[in-house]
From Swiss-Prot:
This is RNA polymerase sigma factor sigD, chloroplastic. InterPro entries: RNA_pol_sigma-70_dom (IPR014284), RNA_pol_sigma70 (IPR000943), RNA_pol_sigma70_r2 (IPR007627), RNA_pol_sigma70_r3 (IPR007624), RNA_pol_sigma70_r4 (IPR007630), RNA_pol_sigma_r2 (IPR013325), RNA_pol_sigma_r3/r4-like (IPR013324), RNA_pol_sigma_SigB/C/D/F (IPR016262). It comes from the Eukaryota. The keyword DNA damage does not apply. A motif (Polymerase core binding) lies at residues 207-220. One of its GO terms (biological process) is DNA-templated transcription initiation. Mostly expressed in leaves, and to a lesser extent in roots. Present in seedlings.
Length: 419
């Protein structure tokens, strides 16, 4: 260790007994040997000389020309705090422990620090422009054919279509591949920082990062450096749009239209705002008033936002009954409804018994009481060989008789229960 001490002349080193070194970790002793002074432009300018030797070290220690330990402690504490702040990104992105070692290795490559867009890129303006130009040229060549692999005929056609030589076309395609890899690697932190804000919405973090990387490359192909913006500023919105579309299309078993997904997102956000404001769960009317929408639209959005439930889900505490055994299908009828229909059919038969056979027949055909399809007066007349007007008169007389029957009010019970 070399230490600088002020002196006016060249230091003279003399033999001395062995002394311990300044480092406590080194348990050896050194014999002080005469050594010439080491001069440098820095020492000459400041009238100092660089002297090495254990005796010089002792003199420096005795004269207290050392940096105080307190200062080193403060700087070390500051460095530790900065490392802890940077390590927060790793902790937030820590994936769930998997038993498969391959999954853990893949997750470790994704756990990168979450930083802002200003620190995510390591490319200069010139590099951004060059890489984006490679992407644009490669995209134009790729649009001329469906395959850009090692096919001589395809390479010739692509080159002739763009008015370029075969060699230059292959170079552009290779540069495009390299540019995609470099942009994806340099702006990965920006993609991760955006993707972490959309966790817990149906897709895991790895899928969100993958979709964000696709949006990053799409935005880079359409980047225009003449506008004066940085690439990170432009692709931010492409990354966000790609992630939102992926959540809308891939996060649910039953896909929702884009407009309905946007409406459900607005309703969910308004519900959270009103919950914090009112300190309770808001109603559909309050959400509709907050968003200036119809109550029916809000209720529809709430229904569509519910996650699907498996029919194999256990519905009882003992675990012996599932939802499939409880929920009825569209063609199934509950036992209570079957009993109600039988009672109502019996009441109607008693009412029709107070009429004549022709009147009962006309009412049955007109209203479809016996499970038949309702018919018009003209169709009933053709069936009974009567005129249309006569059938209408018979129907009116039969209804007038039924209104005067004492037990006609018993049917109102079934009518009110059906509502």
């Amino acid at each position: 260790m070399a230490t600088t001490i002020p002196t006016t002349a060249t230091a003279t080193m003399c033999p001395s007994p062995p002394v311990p070194t300044i480092s406590p970790l080194l348990r050896t002793t050194h014999q002080c040997q005469p050594s010439p002074s080491l001069s440098s432009p820095f020492s000459i300018k400041l009238s100092t000389a660089l002297v090495c030797g254990d005796t010089t070290v002792d003199r420096v220690v005795d004269s207290s020309v050392m940096i105080k330990p307190e200062k080193w402690g403060i700087q070390s504490e500051k460095r530790r705090k900065r490392r802890r702040r940077r390590r927060v990104g790793y902790e937030r992105l820590e994936p769930e422990e998997e038993e498969n070692a391959g999954v853990e290795a893949e997750a470790e490559t994704i756990s990168v620090p979450v930083v802002g867009a200003s620190r995510s890129g390591f490319l200069s303006r010139l590099e951004e422009v060059q890489l984006c130009l490679y992407l644009k040229e490669g995209a134009k060549l790729e649009n001329l054919g469906t395959s850009v692999e090692e096919n001589e005929m395809v390479s010739v056609l692509l080159a002739s279509g763009r008015g370029k030589k075969k060699r230059s076309a292959n170079e552009i395609l290779c540069r495009r591949k390299e540019a995609r890899e470099k942009i994806t690697r340099c702006y990965r932190r920006l993609v991760v920082s955006i993707a972490t804000g959309y966790q817990g919405k149906g897709l895991n973090l790895q899928d969100l990062i993958q979709e964000g990387s696709i949006g990053l490359l799409r935005g880079a192909e359409r980047f225009d450096p003449d506008r004066g913006y940085k690439l990170s500023t432009y692709v931010y919105w492409w990354i966000k749009q790609a992630i939102l579309r992926a959540i809308a299309h891939k996060s649910r078993l039953v896909k929702l239209p884009g407009s309905m997904w946007e409406l459900t997102a607005k309703v969910a956000e308004a519900s959270n705002v009103l919950t914090r404001k009112l300190r309770r769960q808001p109603s559909c009317e309050e959400i509709a008033e907050h968003l200036n929408l119809n109550v029916s639209a809000v209720r529809l959005a709430v229904e569509r936002s519910r996650s699907p439930v498996s029919l194999d889900r256990v519905a009882s505490q003992n675990g012996r009954m599932t939802l499939q055994e409880i929920v009825r299908g569209p063609d199934e009828t509950r036992p209570e409804e079957m009993v109600k229909r039988e009672h109502m059919k019996h009441e109607i038969e008693q009412l029709l018994g107070s009429l004549t056979a022709r009147e009962s027949r006309v009412l049955g055909l007109y209203f479809g009481l016996n499970g038949e399809t309702p018919m018009s007066f003209e169709e009933i007349g053709k069936s009974l060989k009567l005129s249309r007007e006569r059938v209408r008169q018979i129907n009116g007389i039969a209804l007038k008789k039924l209104r005067n029957v004492h037990n006609v009010n018993d049917l109102k019970i079934y009518y009110s229960s059906s509502e």
